[in-house]
Structure formats: C-alpha cells, structure tokens
Design a protein with these regions (language model features):
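Membrane-interfacial amphipathic/re-entrant helices at transmembrane-helix boundaries
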Residues: 1-20, 48, 60-63, 89-93, ...
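Short, non-helical or kinked segments that cap or interrupt transmembrane helices
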Residues: 15, 24-46, 60, 88-93, ...
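Membrane-embedded helix boundary and interhelical linker motif in transport proteins
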Residues: 8, 30-77, 81, 86, ...
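Transmembrane alpha-helical segments in multi-pass inner-membrane proteins
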Residues: 17, 57-69, 194-271
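Hydrophobic core segments of alpha-helical transmembrane domains in multi-pass membrane transport
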Residues: 46-51, 67-74, 99-109, 146-157, ...
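Transmembrane helix-bundle core of multi-pass membrane transporters
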Residues: 86, 91-162, 189, 255, ...
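Helix-loop-helix "hairpin" substructures at the membrane interface of multi-pass membrane proteins
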Residues: 13, 135-215, 239-245
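Alpha-helical transmembrane segments within multi-pass membrane transporters and channels
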Residues: 24, 57-101, 108, 244-245, ...
Length: 293
C-alpha cells in the first residue's frame, strides 16, 4: 500500500471524525456543554441500520433514513429529559449526567443485542476506483465518505448562515440572554441543535460501520472520543475547525499505523491533543470564551 493510499484512507477516516465532531462542536457552541453520550448515539444508529437492513430486510437507504429518525428522536429526548433540567447547573453536574447517559445507552444495547460483535453489511453500493494502472485502489466506502463529509459541511454552513433557524443558533451561541430578549426560543433552538447533531451521528454510524463492519455496544466509544479530540484540535465551537481537526487526526492516525506502530497510533493521536492544548488552548480556529467546561 503506497503513501497516497494511506493518505486517502486517512482523509476518509478523518471525514468520519469530522462528521462526528460536528455534533460536539454545535452542541458546545450553542448550549455550552459537552455531550459525551454523542459517541453512543453513533452506536445506536449503527444498530438501527443493522436491524432495518439485516434483520428486517429493508433497503440500505431506507435503513439509513430510519436510523436518522431514531437518532434524532433519541437526541432530542436526551436533551429534554437529561440536559434541559440542568440548564443552570454547574458544568460538573452536566458532565456527570452526560457520562451517565453514555453508560445507559451502552448497557441498554448490551441488554438488547448482547456483547457479541455483529457483522455489519455495508450500505455503500458505489463501486471503487482503480487509478495509476491499478496500483492505487480507492474503495466505494472511501469515496462516499469523503463526498458525504463535503456535502454535510457545505450544507450545514449554508443552513447556519442563510436560514432563520441558523441565525437563531448563532444568536444563542453569542449571547443567550440577548437572544431571549429578541424573542428567540432558546430551548427550542438547543433542541434543534441536538436533533441535527444526532442525525449527523446516525450518518457517521452508517459510514463508520460500512468501513469497519464490526458492530458492538461499544462501537461508538473510541470514535466518539477521537472526534472530541478533533473538535478540540480544530477549535470546539467552529464548524470549519471540526473539519480541519477531523482530517488532520484521521491522516495522523492512519500514517502512524502504517509507518510507526498500530499499537502506538492512539497514543500519538492523544499526544497531538496535549501539544495543541499547550500551544493553542482554544484550538486552531477556536475563540476564547469566558465560561469554563
């Protein structure tokens, strides 16, 4: 496998991290909280698609749409039941609640589906490409993942900058009190943010499980943590930062597996986080804020 192959597959992995990181960065940017249950919503999306496609025999696209609906409803429910009552609470209380929700989702999946890994059937039907006389192979999953990431980033940027709901999100992220005085329903805006983030988690789950087709109740844990690292690296609260952080993280992880050690790749990724926090605590594109996480 050539350097270019590792680079392209790293960009593909980074695109998945970027899509997941968007959920972290949107929720933090608007609600000023870290939803550490976000990675487990990815797992829920994966199991929803698995159930729809492999168990019920539905078409892959129908399974993906169903998973998006399931994850969206789940995300809004979590926000309403677990996080909204803690709106004025300390960051520590919110953090502990988020960790509790994460364990709850994992254990529910363990109870329903068991601990054995399920073989996930790829929902990608796009054929791969062979370039450079067949020396460079790009899988259909890689192509779809990169394209979907670009479309999501462009669409989400346009949505936030061009729509009333997006403008409301920007207003709430800047000053929640002033947004309330302007007549913006803050609770509804935050709920919409959770809905969008959870829908993106479902899409990320489909892409992740298609690329790495082993599904367990803990499938979303490590990708969720790495996506959080990507969000912090790029500047949590920044949509372009999520993309930059995700791509850099994916490429670094893939190249370190190829040329250094697959066992040390995670250590290298987290070392990168420590370095960026020491050099630039707000991340590459992050802005300094007054609140503490």
């Amino acid at each position: 496998m050539s350097f270019l192959s590792y680079l392209i597959s790293g960009i593909s992995l980074g695109s998945i991290y970027a899509i997941i990181a968007l959920g972290y960065t949107m929720v933090y940017g608007i609600a000023r909280m870290l939803n550490f249950a976000h990675g487990d919503i990815i797992m829920v999306g994966g199991f929803a698609i698995f159930t729809m496609v492999s168990t019920l025999g539905m078409a892959p696209m129908v399974g993906i749409l169903a998973a998006i609906v399931v994850c969206t409803v789940l995300g809004v429910t979590i926000e309403f039941v677990a996080y909204r009552p803690l709106r004025g609470a300390s960051s520590l209380a919110v953090l502990i609640t988020a960790i509790g929700v994460s364990y709850l989702l994992q254990n529910l999946a363990l109870l329903i589906f068991g601990s054995n890994a399920r073989q996930f059937t790829s929902v990608v039907t796009v054929p791969g490409l062979k370039l450079a006389g067949g020396r460079l192979s790009i899988s259909g999953e890689t192509i779809v993942t990169i394209v979907v990431c670009i479309v999501i980033m462009a669409g989400l940027t346009g949505f936030i900058n061009k729509t009333k709901v997006g403008q409301a999100m920007l207003a709430v992220s800047e000053d929640r009190g002033a947004a309330t005085l302007m007549g913006i329903n803050v609770n509804r805006t935050i709920a919409i943010t959770f809905a969008i983030g959870s829908a993106l988690a479902a899409i990320a789950g489909a892409l992740l499980c298609s690329t790495y087709p082993s599904l367990t109740p803990y499938t979303g844990s490590m990708p969720g943590i790495k996506a959080f690292v990507a969000a912090v690296f790029g500047g949590i609260g920044s949509i372009p930062g999520a993309l930059i952080g995700g791509i850099i993280l994916g490429v670094v992880e893939n190249l370190s597996k190829a040329y250094i050690s697959s066992q040390l790749s995670d250590a290298i990724v987290f070392s990168l986080l420590i370095i960026i926090l020491l050099v630039r605590p707000t991340g590459i594109l992050g802005k300094k804020i007054n609140e503490k996480v």
